[in-house]
Amino acid sequence: MNAEPPEEKAASEAEAGAMPEKRAGSRAAGGNSLQGFGRPSVYHAAIVIFLEFFAWGLLTTSMLTVLHETFPQHTFLMNGLIQGVKGLLSFLSAPLIGALSDVWGRKPFLLGTVFFTCFPIPLMRISPWWYFAMISISGVFSVTFSVIFAYVADVTQEHERSTAYGWVSATFAASLVSSPAIGAYLSASYGDSLVVLVATVVALLDICFILLAVPESLPEKMRPLSWGARISWKQADPFASLKKVGKDSTILLICITVFLSYLPEAGQYSSFFLYLRQVIGFGSIKIAAFIAMVGILSIVAQTVFLTSLMRSLGNKNTVLLGLGFQMFQLAWYGFGSQAWMMWAAGIVAAVSSITFPAVSTLVSQNADSNQQGVAQGIITGIRGLCNGLGPALYGFIFYMFHVELTELEPELISNNAALQGAVIPGPPFLFGACIVFMSFLVAVFIPEYSKGGIQKHSNSISGSLANTPERGSDEDIEPLLQDSSIWELSSLEEPGHQCTEL
């Protein structure tokens, strides 16, 4: 195989570090795959995330009711199992979908993940059993964040990504500011059927936006030269992806940090609203107001504060600060027995939301420009594993401590009385604080920035493959992504058509 001409190499180097405006020009010949409104930008990704989670936020109150009506016994436990199955399926599929988006582009997988994630929404009123079954199965495609973060990496320079990831995460929080309150109001005034209808319409709007307005962000030259490809299932195996993590100490530390920090967060997210309503005595309005408060503060934390912290403290110290706040708020929830304590801990929880965008920036810095989907897919896969284990773990701990959803009325005098006498009112949250403490200890050993871990090749795919015979040399090879190919071209190499490995 011949090395690519200097002109093409220079062009590809410019492509790897260009701003979205410059990228758009080089992709002008992309054809129909670039259909969309304007140039690819962070705003497209933010709108997709906002609409998807706004639709689900509308169902917050209704879902609590349907969950209790469908599983009147062991509600916490069943909630944990449902979310657990969904999370495990997400773990299995995230590396594959992230890697496929590196091959075929981001837009088709944005469309697929949003469609299948929102597919269960109308089933809530049609058949609750099918609704919860489809929620579990939809975990196969519930990896929108993986593709979104890869999309953002495509359209931003490296030094811009922490801010961009912060905006995307803040958009997620913004989608939950008003949607639960709107859903609670519509449910109380017009019934759950209207809430489900509105959520379905919002989900359809999101799908139409992706289909008609979102342009493709991945350059054509970063994709395979032939469609005659077959899947190498060994490389598509999520456990194989996790094995690659161990080849790079920096990525290994990051992944362990993500696992230990997100495991309690996933459990908390799956059960906290039930906990507020059952144990603390929050009504639907208070729950919606609580979500709005935390959402607004999270937006401020992930935009204004995150940017300032990244500049003043650095990436690693920002992650450590976020983990410290997360540990504090979980311990507060664990020992808290009064409503005001929940509100105060919610403020701390909002500040701790800076952790994930800061970690995503660390991952992006240690991944090659044409492997952002794979790298973010691995992190999303780990989060998916936590989404499976966390809810099940919290549900089991609630079950062991005999905390059950026996009533949905806000006035829970007997439960509150029992809560007052409990030494640890929220055992799962205190357990989560201990896990986050271990995550903090691991994160201490993460280097601020490691260029030696995964080489930052600015040349294009074809150019890097031209040097494939030299991989046996003593030079450093990117340890995480060197075996991340999931595609093997079935066509023989011909003059002018070299085998492409991603």
UniProtKB/Swiss-Prot annotation:
GO terms for molecular function: transmembrane transporter activity. SUPFAM superfamilies: MFS general substrate transporter (SSF103473). Residues 1-12 have a biased composition (Basic and acidic residues). Keywords: Membrane, Transmembrane, Transmembrane helix, Transport. It is a multi-pass membrane protein. It is found in: Membrane. The keyword Membrane applies. The chain crosses the membrane at residues 47-67, 80-100, 109-129, 132-152, 166-186, 194-214, 249-269, 279-299, 317-337, 339-359, 385-405, 426-446. InterPro entries: MFS, MFS_dom, MFS_trans_sf, Sugar_transporter_CS, Tet-R_TetA/multi-R_MdtG-like. Residues 1-27 are annotated as: Disordered. Residues 1-46, 101-108, 153-165, 215-248, 300-316, 360-384, 447-502 are extracellular. GO terms for cellular component: membrane. Signal peptide: none annotated. Residues 68-79, 130-131, 187-193, 270-278, 338, 406-425 are cytoplasmic. Belongs to the major facilitator superfamily. This is Hippocampus abundant transcript-like protein 1.
